[in-house]
């Protein structure tokens, strides 16, 4: 998110020239304005879920199962989206499995890669040396690997857990993509397996929205001849019940946003209440985090309008006034602002007051101060970009990234996300950890910033925009746009490696917190994969409908 708008008053009191972005309008009209939760259906789902949960819990802790079977059960639970019900039991099982793991010669590629991915996802640093037996004396993959589609698919997914210095996993990633792409639609794959491969190549497990990926996997799993009907039934019920909760929450948010009526006062801004809630649901979908989803959505909406104000409407002089007002964080500062900014500033103060009151009821309002300070920091960095645009200044890539890691919103989103977690998880120490500018938060911000720079570059430059990371890199290195894009994607991949490494034990803070930073990073991979899906919401419209409207047939 970067500033592109400056303007000068012409002929005294005339309206300044503004480089309006003409963002696409909201897609949703009044679609989410009303929703009545079917309490009878909710209770019906809930009663059966409780019975099935106990049956599945018994499966997880039951002895006598081989390690490969146990790791596969854990994988299925995670991919079906129901593992959050059994976190304690799963962690206990994984601790035992990792301690006893041996690179058994009988394990095939599918099983080894599955162990690797599951262990790494849970912070256990399994060495990629476990894959050596699938390579020949020249270091190339054995011919048998190319004939093992399930094994290659499992290895492909495992490569997304790589850290720096693991060149083999880079090679394996390129190899499996090439092999799997060559097989899609061919005679050697069943239609069901081909569908799985195509989806995996489009969206990896590790970088996908957990709830969306669960829904996809449920559709694959119910076609699996070896499926467990109890697991499948639990997954369907759980998805549909949680969807009802999310839909009700979205209705409350949507009505709140309509009643706030901010967009009518700042019509230049993107109207994205539904998309912000979608974003928040990726950060945490679990039922106990309803307050967190509401808090994060509201703050994201305010930041979105603030970004558009700096990016596509405000003059430089107006933006300086607004920056100063945000630093003061006092209602009296409103008097100095233009009318349209008064509406935004009033909303900012009121929403944070509302959030603070709601969290104070639960004794966890101490994070609000940190969120406010992060918001102030972003606004200061927005003004820096506004000044760069005004002066026609192209920063060095290093100077750009120093400021961009602030405007990428990593600190604000992480802080605001933590505010919605339980007090015994998001402690005061957790918020202080964010202030240390940890590598994981920086990496998450870098991913979001660089992906957005690439995907929105042409459109932003067409209307007039501060030099992005792509422009700064091209000028400093004297390379073409395409060459710069290649280098920026290398940086994005390294940032993902850093995230993966920061989640390996021992971790700096609780894994329950780190998973939220990971989830915030996943948003960039889904929403900005091919184009800026936040600015152009039709790109992610099907995702929104799938998550919040379309239940799974029972």
Curated annotation (Swiss-Prot):
Alphabetized InterPro entries for the sequence: Isoprenoid_synthase_dom_sf, Terpene_cyclase-like_1_C, Terpene_cyclase_plant_C1, Terpene_synth_N, Terpene_synth_N_sf, Terpene_synthase-like, Terpene_synthase_metal-bd, Terpenoid_cyclase/PrenylTrfase
Necessary cofactors: Mg(2+)
UniProt note on tissues of expression: Expressed in flowers.
Pathway the protein contributes to: Secondary metabolite biosynthesis; terpenoid biosynthesis
Range of residues in the leader sequence: none
Lineage top rank: taxon: Eukaryota
Pfam families assigned to the protein according to its UniProt record, in alphabetical order: Terpene_synth (PF01397), Terpene_synth_C (PF03936)
UniProt comment concerning the protein's domains: The Asp-Asp-Xaa-Xaa-Asp/Glu (DDXXD/E) motif is important for the catalytic activity, presumably through binding to Mg(2+).
Similarity comment: Belongs to the terpene synthase family.
Identification of the protein by name: Valerianol synthase TPS1A
Organism: Camellia hiemalis (Camellia)
């Amino acid at each position: 998110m970067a500033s592109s708008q400056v303007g000068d008053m012409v002929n005294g009191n005339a309206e300044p020239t503004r480089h309006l972005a003409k963002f696409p309008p909201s897609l949703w009209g009044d679609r989410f304005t009303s929703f009545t939760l079917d309490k009878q259906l909710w209770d019906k789902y809930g009663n059966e879920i409780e019975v099935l949960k106990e049956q599945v819990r018994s499966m997880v802790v039951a002895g006598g199962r081989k390690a490969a079977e146990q790791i596969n059960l854990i994988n299925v639970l995670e991919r079906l989206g129901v593992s959050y019900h059994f976190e304690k039991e799963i962690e206990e099982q994984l601790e035992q499995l990792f301690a006893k793991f041996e690179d058994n010669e009988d394990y095939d590629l599918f099983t080894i890669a599955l162990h690797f991915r599951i262990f790494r996802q849970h912070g256990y640093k399994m060495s990629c040396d476990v894959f050596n037996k699938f390579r020949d004396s020249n270091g190339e993959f054995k011919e048998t690997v190319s004939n093992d589609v399930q094994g290659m698919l499992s290895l492909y997914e495992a490569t997304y857990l790589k850290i720096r210095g693991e060149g083999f996993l880079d090679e394996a990633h390129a190899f499996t993509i090439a092999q799997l792409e060559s097989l899609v639609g061919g005679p050697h794959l069943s239609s069901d397996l081909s569908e799985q491969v195509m989806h995996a190549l489009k969206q990896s497990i590790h970088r996908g929205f957990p709830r969306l990926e669960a829904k996809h996997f449920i559709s694959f799993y119910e076609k699996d001849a070896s499926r467990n009907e109890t697991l499948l039934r639990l997954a369907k019920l759980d998805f549909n019940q949680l969807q009802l909760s999310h839909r009700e929450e979205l209705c409350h948010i949507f009505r709140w946003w309509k009643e706030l009526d901010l967009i009518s006062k700042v019509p230049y801004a993107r109207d994205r209440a539904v998309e912000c809630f979608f974003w928040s649901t990726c950060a945490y979908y679990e039922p106990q985090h309803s307050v967190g989803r509401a808090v994060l959505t509201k703050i994201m909406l305010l930041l979105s309008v603030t970004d558009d104000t700096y990016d596509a409407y405000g003059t430089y002089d107006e933006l300086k006034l607004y920056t100063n007002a945000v630093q003061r964080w006092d209602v009296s500062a409103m008097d100095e602002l233009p009318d349209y900014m008064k509406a935004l500033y009033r909303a900012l103060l009121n929403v944070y007051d509302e959030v603070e009151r709601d969290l104070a009821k639960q004794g966890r309002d101490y994070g609000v101060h940190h969120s406010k300070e992060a918001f102030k920091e972003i606004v200061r960095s927005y003004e820096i970009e506004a000044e760069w645009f005004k002066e026609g200044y192209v920063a060095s890539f290093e100077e750009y990234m120093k400021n961009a890691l602030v405007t990428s919103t990593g600190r604000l989103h992480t802080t605001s996300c933590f505010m919605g977690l339980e007090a015994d998880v998001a402690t005061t120490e957790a918020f202080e950890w964010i202030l240390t500018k940890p590598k994981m938060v920086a990496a998450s911000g870098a991913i979001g910033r660089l992906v957005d720079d690439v995907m929105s570059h042409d459109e932003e430059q067409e209307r007039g925009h501060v030099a992005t990371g792509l422009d700064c890199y091209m000028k400093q290195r004297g390379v073409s746009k395409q060459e710069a894009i290649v280098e920026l994607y290398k940086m994005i991949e390294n940032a993902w490696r850093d995230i993966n490494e920061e989640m390996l034990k021992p971790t700096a803070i609780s894994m329950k917190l780190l998973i939220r930073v990971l989830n915030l990073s996943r948003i960039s991979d889904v929403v900005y994969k091919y184009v800026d899906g936040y600015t152009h919401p039709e790109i992610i419209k099907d995702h929104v409908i799938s998550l919040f409207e379309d239940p799974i047939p029972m």
